[in-house]
Curated annotation (Swiss-Prot):
The keyword rRNA processing applies. InterPro entries: KsgA/Erm, rRNA_Ade_diMease-like_C, rRNA_Ade_Mease_Trfase_CS, rRNA_Ade_methylase_Trfase_N, rRNA_adenine_dimethylase, SAM-dependent_MTases_sf. Specifically dimethylates two adjacent adenosines (A1518 and A1519) in the loop of a conserved hairpin near the 3'-end of 16S rRNA in the 30S particle. May play a critical role in biogenesis of 30S subunits. This is Ribosomal RNA small subunit methyltransferase A. GO terms for cellular component: cytosol. The keyword tRNA processing does not apply. Gene3D superfamilies: Ribosomal RNA adenine dimethylase-like, domain 2 (1.10.8.100), Vaccinia Virus protein VP39 (3.40.50.150). Belongs to the class I-like SAM-binding methyltransferase superfamily. rRNA adenine N(6)-methyltransferase family. RsmA subfamily. It comes from the Bacteria. The gene is rsmA. It is found in: Cytoplasm. It comes from Natranaerobius thermophilus (strain ATCC BAA-1301 / DSM 18059 / JW/NM-WN-LF). Pfam families: RrnaAD. Keywords: Cytoplasm, Methyltransferase, RNA-binding, rRNA processing, S-adenosyl-L-methionine, Transferase. Its EC number is 2.1.1.182.
């Protein structure tokens, strides 16, 4: 079956009486060149374990299976599971998993390949080096941001994520301070990953065609996160609160999560070279980390 042929894809969907759901972001990639560019960006190797979220018809899954050790293809829609059994069910290294990617316990999922040590928040290799654990997906648009943040927060030791996302989402991932797209997701991802846009994807390479353009982004895990593990949960809370209202100053946004007075917070900022009236979107990621560490060390967190 030629999954790069819109006509054959249409026939396949009709055979299973499936009408793609916009609510699930079901626009299927039908361009082999784009598939190969995604695989090249991920630098897939035969030792790699790949998480693929939203495999759809299995187009990317099938091509990746020739390059890697194992694939965990996680699909929410039971109708797609039936198709995947036909298109990639015969691939020995593809595990089709019917589950919600936003609720799945990823550490449990890959425990057969990696032994986790919660006390050290690290992982010890069983069968593979953690550097060989990657996520490669044409993500359903509606889950892109929450999924990537979930993987970061839960410390799933992914060395690389290569993801196709809506262009608007990619712009938020890679935004610069002061821009309209710069927000909490930008800051948090940059703390854990080096984020780059790889290439744009036109809507014409999908069936059915979406209304928006896409972009493939690459997130490479930093050798050391910008915030120590012990403080990451509080830092995430801090950053989210800093962008709670873009029209408010940083001090006014974060006041509710600290026990200190507003004047004390303002004074701390000014003593360290920052304006008391600065807003979250004006700060670089490194400045966010710097301010958090200063305030955290001087005022008890509520």
């Amino acid at each position: 079956m030629n999954l790069f042929s819109p006509k054959e894809v249409s026939q396949l969907l009709k055979r299973y009486e499936i009408h793609p759901k916009k609510s699930l972001g079901q626009n299927f990639l039908v361009d082999g060149n784009i598939i190969q560019k995604i695989i090249a960006a991920a630098e897939l190797k035969e030792q790699d374990i790949v998480l693929e979220i939203g495999p759809g018809l299995g187009t990317l899954t099938r091509d990746m299976s020739f390059y890697v050790n194992e694939i965990f293809a996680i699909e929410l829609d039971q109708r797609m599971i039936d198709i995947l059994q036909e298109t990639v069910g015969s691939c020995d290294n593809v595990n089709i998993i019917h589950n919600d990617a936003l609720k799945l316990d990823y550490q449990e999922l890959i425990s057969d390949f990696i032994e986790f040590s919660p006390a050290q928040l690290q992982c010890k290799s069983k069968q593979i080096n953690p550097k060989n654990l990657k996520a490669v997906s044409n993500l359903p648009y509606y889950i892109a941001s929450p999924l990537v943040l979930k993987l970061a927060k839960e410390k799933v030791p992914l060395s690389v994520m290569v993801l196709m996302v809506q262009r608007e989402v990619a712009d938020r991932f890679t935004a610069s301070p002061g821009s309209k797209n710069y927000g909490a997701v930008t800051v948090l991802l940059d703390c854990f990953y080096e984020v780059e846009g790889v290439f744009n994807v036109p809507k014409t390479v999908f069936y059915p065609q979406p209304r928006v353009e896409s972009q493939v982004v690459k997130l490479t895990k930093r050798s050391e996160a910008k915030i120590n593990d012990d403080y990451q949960e509080d830092f995430i809370k801090f950053v989210n609160q800093a962008f709670n209202s873009r029209r408010k100053t940083l001090v006014n946004n974060i006041l509710s999560i600290f026990t200190g007075e507003k004047s004390e917070l303002s004074q701390i900022l000014e003593n360290n070279g920052f304006s008391a009236g600065i807003r979250g979107e004006q700060l670089t990621v490194d400045e966010f980390a710097q301010i958090f560490k200063i305030i955290y060390n001087r005022i008890k967190y509520s």
